[in-house]
Every structure is written in C-alpha cells, then in structure tokens.
Amino acid sequence: MIIRLAGMSVRQGCLLGLLMCALMMGVALVLQYVYGLTPCPLCIGQRIAVLLAAFVFAIGALHNPAGNLGRGLYAGLAALASVLGLAVAARHVWLQSLPPENVPSCGPGLDYMMEVLPLWDVLSRVLAGSGECAEIHGSLLGMSIPQWTLLGFAVLLLIPLGMLAGIVIRRR
C-alpha cells in the first residue's frame, strides 16, 4: 500500500488524506449530533488533530508542489498531525482500559478551564484525560470509539508516509 501511495502526486495524496479526515470528522459529528454523544476533552483533542491534518492536506492539494521539498514538507506536517492524533487516541484507549479504581477523577469542564486557566495548563489537563474520558459509550465490532479513532489515525498516517516514501523511490 505504501508503494502505491508513493506513486501518487502530491495533490492525489493530499486529496486522499483530506477525504480520510472528512470521513473521520463526519463520523465524529454524526456521533455527536445524531446519537447525542458529547465529546470528552480527549475526543476534542483528537478532532483538533484531524482538523490540523485536514488543513495541511488541503493546503498541499491546492499548492501541489512539484519538488521533493514541498512533498516532504506537506507529508511531514501531515504525519506530525497524524502522530499527534494517534498519541491522543492511544491515551484515550489506555484510560478506558484502566480498572475503575485507577481512573482519574473528573475535573472541571473545558469551558470553565478555558476561562480560568492559562492555555498551557488547559492543554496539559485535557491531555491527561479525566474520568469522563474513561467511559465507554458503546462499541462497534467489539471496538470502542477511541479504538476506532486510533485505527483511523493509523490509516491516516499511512498517507503521508507513502508520500515520504515517494521521495525515497524517486531518488533511486
């Protein structure tokens, strides 16, 4: 699969990445607005990572650089956003796997923290997760929503890795 992605143009790779981001955000919004699942702080962090990757992919698709420098830049930034989302999703899955007595207690709401605390403190508390992040709200095919999101970020990461592989293959 990586080799097939390596043969794509920057625009094709970025459009594929953008499509994957749209799919991930679409599912998140359906879960929120159709099924009434309120996103926890880690879910919001994952959404931010998807939006960052989507932004990079959109700019890359519009720019469509011909050289390896542009290809590497967009692929590297998209990979960074994907790894960020992967890390937040992994943290979320880990929190859900904890025994109930080890789950962190619920803290103040995100809106309140944004009003009262400096941004860095809010980010560190959000990424630490809380009790609400450990709740499992159903599953599909035996996997929780954060597990599916983790899988989504892993698939998303393949796209910029394929774009980076294209640089290596072209240099041979």
From Swiss-Prot:
GO molecular function: electron transfer activity; protein-disulfide reductase activity
Mode of membrane association: Multi-pass membrane protein
Keyword Disulfide bond (UniProt): yes
GO cellular component labels: plasma membrane
Keywords: Cell inner membrane, Cell membrane, Chaperone, Disulfide bond, Electron transport, Membrane, Oxidoreductase, Redox-active center, Transmembrane, Transmembrane helix, Transport
Major localization listed first in the record, in broad terms: membrane
GO BP annotation list: protein folding
Residue intervals annotated with topology Periplasmic: 31-48, 91-147
Transmembrane segments annotated in the record for this chain: 14-30, 49-65, 73-90, 148-166
Topology, Cytoplasmic side: 1-13, 66-72, 167-172
UniProt subcellular location: Cell inner membrane
Disulfide bonds listed in the record: 40-43, 106-133
PANTHER family: DISULFIDE BOND FORMATION PROTEIN B
Functional description taken from the UniProt entry: Required for disulfide bond formation in some periplasmic proteins. Acts by oxidizing the DsbA protein.
HAMAP family, A to Z: DsbB
Entry similarity comment: Belongs to the DsbB family.
Designated name of the protein: Disulfide bond formation protein B
